[in-house]
């Protein structure tokens, strides 16, 4: 009897270590239960990519790897360019908080990587780097590199150098969402599930730089004045914006022709000059559209988007549509709601501007849609979410919606648009009425 009680205590203790929900993870818990190491993972062409690997102290059960690839900062860095990574410094990246905590709570190996040419990662960065490896993905024998081959090489290293169960998940929002799409195109067999969220997809037809071919000056001019810059060498510091617009945007741009704006940047923004020299939807833009290559995708895919996303609403729904069309056998899921860009990453999100749509919609998305999706496909545990989960705008008056949980308003469908749905034309009338 004592042996049974002892066995029960050991099992309960080992399971309990990872049984908490992500909302309960604290800095102290993370430091007690995770180690961090910073490595420079070699790619096939010799370039090395900065990678922060967070590994659970307990190795009682092999767990999956959750990978996020990003061009944005992963501060704090434990070393400077030209130095060797320090093994003694533990400082978690802000990327560990928010939408990754469920995976930390469950003991996943969490990996954050700066893509080629950003921060401490070597070689040159290229905006929405063209997909050159084609159907072969990372298995290509051509002497080329792209985001698919870099993902493939990263996964190979992770499988060999971390304790894991052999399954990899990849997720990301906005630009990292683009890299999640490229992970599916890497064709690595260990990548079982990916989630492109508000993914940069087509910078001409609808995402960031253009909307239906119309140049989005405000977005490009401010975001691009840092993102489109070329760095001189690897660094822990990002590129500063060249411009800061403090006045009214309309007044700022209305009196300036595009040539004047371009002249201000000169040769400092090579991608800006390329972009404005391709005013039509030509090969330059099509080469940078990953959705055109989404054929015969094998990993399960959860696409996430916000109806009020001003940056990459197009990318989410176009990615979903292209996967339905080009990869009908893919296990495809969609989650969408009345969110701004990346709004679902916040557990407490309940409104946008003056419109309210239910409390804690981000919490429901993270706990009841995204996490179960990855857990099912990476561990074979739990149940899959519905194929389509949508939180409609519905009633938006604060007096009626504040305090009501969003769980009451989510709708589930088998596909999107829903079967038997009929389109309705909406017209803007005088006095700004619909």
Language model regions located:
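Alpha/beta-hydrolase fold nucleophile elbow
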Residues: 163-174
């Amino acid at each position: 009897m004592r042996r049974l009680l002892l066995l029960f205590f050991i099992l309960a203790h080992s399971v309990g270590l990872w049984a908490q929900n992500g909302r309960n993870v604290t800095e102290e818990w993370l430091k007690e239960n995770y180690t961090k190491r910073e490595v420079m993972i070699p790619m096939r062409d010799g370039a090395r990519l900065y990678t922060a690997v967070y590994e659970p102290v307990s190795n009682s059960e092999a767990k999956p790897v959750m990978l996020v690839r990003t061009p944005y900062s992963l501060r704090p860095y434990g070393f400077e360019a030209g130095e060797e990574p320090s093994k003694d410094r533990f400082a978690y990246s802000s990327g560990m908080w928010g939408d990754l905590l469920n995976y930390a709570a469950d003991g996943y190996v969490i990996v954050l990587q700066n893509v080629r040419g950003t921060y401490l990662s070597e070689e040159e960065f290229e905006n929405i780097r063209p997909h050159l490896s084609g159907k072969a993905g990372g298995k290509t024998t051509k002497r080329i590199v792209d985001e698919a081959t870099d993902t493939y090489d990263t996964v190979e290293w992770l499988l060999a150098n971390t304790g894991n169960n052999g399954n990899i998940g990849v997720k990301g929002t906005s630009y990292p969402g683009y890299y999640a799409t490229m992970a599916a195109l890497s064709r690595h067999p260990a990548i079982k599930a990916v989630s492109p969220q508000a993914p940069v997809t087509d910078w001409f037809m609808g995402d960031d730089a253009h909307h239906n071919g119309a140049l989005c000056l405000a977005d490009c001019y401010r975001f691009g004045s840092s993102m489109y810059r070329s760095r001189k060498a690897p660094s822990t510091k990002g590129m500063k914006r060249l411009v800061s617009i403090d006045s009214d945007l309309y007044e700022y741009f209305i009196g300036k022709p595009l040539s004047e704006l371009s002249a201000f940047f000169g040769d400092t923004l090579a991608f800006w000059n390329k972009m404005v020299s391709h005013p039509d939807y030509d090969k330059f833009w099509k080469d940078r559209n990953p959705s055109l290559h989404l054929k015969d995708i094998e990993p399960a895919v959860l696409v996430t988007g916000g109806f009020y996303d001003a940056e990459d609403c197009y990318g989410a729904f176009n990615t979903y549509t292209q996967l339905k069309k080009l990869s009908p056998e893919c296990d495809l899921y969609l989650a969408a709601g009345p969110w701004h860009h990346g709004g679902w990453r916040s557990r407490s999100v309940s409104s946008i501007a003056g419109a309210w749509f239910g409390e804690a919609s981000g919490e429901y998305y993270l706990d009841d849609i995204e996490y179960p999706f990855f857990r099912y496909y990476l561990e074979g545990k739990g149940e899959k979410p519905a194929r389509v989960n949508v939180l409609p705008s519905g009633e938006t008056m604060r007096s009626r919606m504040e305090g009501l949980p969003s769980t009451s308003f989510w709708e589930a469908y088998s596909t999107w648009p829903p079967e038997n749905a009929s389109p309705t034309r909406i017209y803007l009338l005088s006095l700004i009425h619909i």
